[in-house]
């Protein structure tokens, strides 16, 4: 048999296998566009506007439909009712995490973000309990965030009102808050170890959320056999792992089991107490992966939201004026803002919620997976099937948020100007997989933004109407365009 004949037969077999697998599944799964062999629905999706593609498909096939990315079926949930029904009403069944090949290479099924089963449940339980023990929701962690906000203000003063790109400095503050929780100590913004750690973490988040990595995850052979940025992720994680293990070693040498100082201490104490069944959950490898997950989730997302918030506040100076008026009235100039102030600052609270709703940071959430065969709206979704929840369709629902494409803090205010909660506010996801650091992120956004606005006037380099708001969608995360501004001391 010559090479050409062999290749033709191999390709034909792959196409037939792909067709058979797709047809055998389609009778059970929700409807959707007809996929092509091997590549699935890739040609029917606008990769530059994936969210619009999902909206268009939902108009044809309804709020629950199936797409094929390669030969792999993806069930898409579009709209508040479908998302709520899955993540909240059937929370346990939809609490799985998709097996993402690149994440599997890094985490080996460990950590809190991409793990499943008992390992995920135990790690998440420990993480939430430890954050509470360290003062989440209390003055302890709040004081750390307030201290970091003041350090940020001092760094901004050093710009002396000159134009600057806020990207780096706004990344330092949330990263340092995580450092203080994990390692006990914060770092100077010029500390070499801190800068290198932040560089590696930020590079990995950007690469992992890039379109190329989404392609690699759908065609896993590319990871091992093709050059590309994914190799840098593995190299960066090797550095992060080595750095974290060195920190763990320092903690092991100075550990006082009666007086835990930080997240690592609590983990090491629990490790000593763990029985033989719990040993895997309390291994050093799981600690490293969990810390890496906390940094990735708690640094880039918060710093990007802060960066987007400043851009929106320059675009809408009337909103900024109302927020600063509220800060002057409630906080004044002689003390720093605290969390007790938030209940008396409804407009500021509404503005922060509207920033998160409007920017739609993670448009389609991290992919879920069903943990068992489930009948959902008369369809059968087999165990292990990937489920994508369109948070865009929830956060930009015109029934809940009139004119959803407009930035308007009034979306979260009632007729009397009081803050108004919304069940549609799912920026941190919902259900069993809701972000473990939601409370910390909310605290950081309020304290850092109010502290900046208490101390500075935000000056754009262009007229507000000329400020570019077109987001850069980097696969997983929506990023604001690059910009500069001046922080003018008040």
UniProtKB/Swiss-Prot annotation:
PROSITE patterns assigned: CYTOCHROME_P450
Pathway(s) annotated for this protein in UniProt: Lipid metabolism; arachidonate metabolism
Protein's membrane topology: Peripheral membrane protein
Domain of life: Eukaryota
InterPro entries per UniProt: Cyt_P450, Cyt_P450_CS, Cyt_P450_E_grp-I, Cyt_P450_sf, Cytochrome_P450_fam2
UniProt keywords, alphabetically: Endoplasmic reticulum, Heme, Iron, Lipid metabolism, Membrane, Metal-binding, Microsome, Monooxygenase, Oxidoreductase, Signal
Pfam families: p450 (PF00067)
A GO CC term assigned to this protein in UniProt: endoplasmic reticulum membrane
GO biological process: arachidonate metabolic process
Binding sites annotated in the UniProt record for heme: 435
Catalytic activity: an organic molecule + reduced [NADPH--hemoprotein reductase] + O2 = an alcohol + oxidized [NADPH--hemoprotein reductase] + H2O + H(+); (5Z,8Z,11Z,14Z)-eicosatetraenoate + reduced [NADPH--hemoprotein reductase] + O2 = 11,12-epoxy-(5Z,8Z,14Z)-eicosatrienoate + oxidized [NADPH--hemoprotein reductase] + H2O + H(+)
GO molecular function: arachidonate 11,12-epoxygenase activity; arachidonate 14,15-epoxygenase activity; heme binding; iron ion binding; oxidoreductase activity, acting on paired donors, with incorporation or reduction of molecular oxygen, reduced flavin or flavoprotein as one donor, and incorporation of one atom of oxygen
Cofactor(s), names only, from the UniProt record: heme
Annotated EC: 1.14.14.1
Tissue expression as described in the entry: Liver, brain, kidney, and intestine, with trace amounts in lung and heart.
Record's signal peptide: 1-20
Coiled coil: none
Record localization: Endoplasmic reticulum membrane; Microsome membrane
Function: A cytochrome P450 monooxygenase that primarily catalyzes the epoxidation of 11,12 double bond of (5Z,8Z,11Z,14Z)-eicosatetraenoic acid (arachidonate) forming 11,12-epoxyeicosatrienoic acid (11,12-EET) regioisomer. Mechanistically, uses molecular oxygen inserting one oxygen atom into a substrate, and reducing the second into a water molecule, with two electrons provided by NADPH via cytochrome P450 reductase (CPR; NADPH--hemoprotein reductase).
Family: Belongs to the cytochrome P450 family.
The name this protein goes by in its record: Cytochrome P450 2C38
Taxonomic lineage: Eukaryota, Metazoa, Chordata, Craniata, Vertebrata
Gene: Cyp2c38
């Amino acid at each position: 048999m010559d090479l050409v004949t062999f290749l033709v037969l191999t390709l034909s077999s792959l196409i037939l296998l792909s067709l058979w697998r797709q047809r055998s599944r389609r009778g059970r799964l929700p409807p959707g566009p007809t996929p092509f062999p091997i590549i699935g629905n890739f040609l029917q999706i606008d990769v530059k506007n994936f969210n619009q593609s999902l909206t268009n498909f939902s108009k044809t096939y309804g709020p629950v439909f199936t797409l094929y990315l390669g030969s792999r079926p993806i069930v898409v949930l579009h709209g508040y009712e479908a998302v709520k029904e899955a993540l909240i009403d059937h929370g346990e069944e939809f609490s799985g995490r998709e097996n993402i090949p690149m994440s599997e290479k890094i985490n080996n099924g460990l950590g809190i973000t991409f793990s499943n089963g008992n390992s995920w449940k135990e790690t998440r339980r420990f993480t939430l309990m430890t954050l509470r023990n360290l003062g989440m929701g209390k003055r302890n962690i709040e004081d750390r965030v307030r201290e970091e906000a003041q350090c940020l203000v001092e760094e901004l003063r050093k710009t002396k009102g000159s134009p600057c790109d806020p990207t780096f400095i706004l990344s330092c503050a949330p990263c340092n808050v995580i450092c203080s929780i994990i390692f006990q100590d914060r770092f100077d913004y010029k500390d070499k170890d801190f800068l290198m750690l932040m560089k590696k973490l930020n590079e990995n988040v950007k690469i992992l959320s890039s379109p190329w990595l989404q392609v690699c995850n759908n065609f896993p052979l590319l990871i091992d056999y093709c050059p590309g940025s994914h190799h840098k992720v593995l190299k960066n994680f090797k550095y992060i792992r080595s750095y974290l293990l060195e920190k763990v070693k320092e903690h092991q040498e100075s550990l006082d089991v009666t007086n835990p100082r930080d997240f690592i201490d609590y983990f090491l104490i629990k490790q000593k107490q763990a029985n033989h069944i719990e040993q895997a959950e309390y291994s050093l490898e799981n600690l490293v992966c969990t810390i890496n997950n906390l940094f990735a989730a708690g640094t880039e997302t918060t710093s990007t939201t802060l960066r987007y918030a400043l851009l929106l506040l320059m675009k809408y100076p009337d909103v900024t004026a109302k927020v600063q008026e509220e800060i002057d009235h409630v906080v004044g100039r002689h003390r720093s803002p605290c969390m007790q102030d938030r209940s008396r600052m409804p407009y500021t609270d509404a503005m922060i919620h509207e920033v998160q709703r409007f920017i739609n940071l993670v448009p389609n959430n991290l992919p879920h997976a069903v943990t068992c065969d489930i009948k959902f709206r008369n369809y059968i979704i087999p165990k292990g099937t990937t489920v994508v929840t369109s948070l865009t369709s929830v956060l930009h629902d015109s029934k809940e948020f009139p004119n959803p494409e407009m930035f308007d803090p009034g979306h979260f205010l009632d007729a009397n100007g009081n803050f108004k909660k919304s069940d549609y506010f799912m920026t941190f996801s919902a259900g069993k997989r809701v972000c473990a650091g939601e409370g910390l992120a909310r605290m950081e956004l309020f304290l850092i933004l109010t502290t900046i606005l208490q101390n500075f006037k935000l000056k754009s380099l262009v007229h507000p109407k000329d400020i570019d708001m077109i987001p850069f969608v980097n696969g997983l995360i929506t990023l604001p365009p690059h910009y500069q501004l001046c922080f003018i001391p008040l």
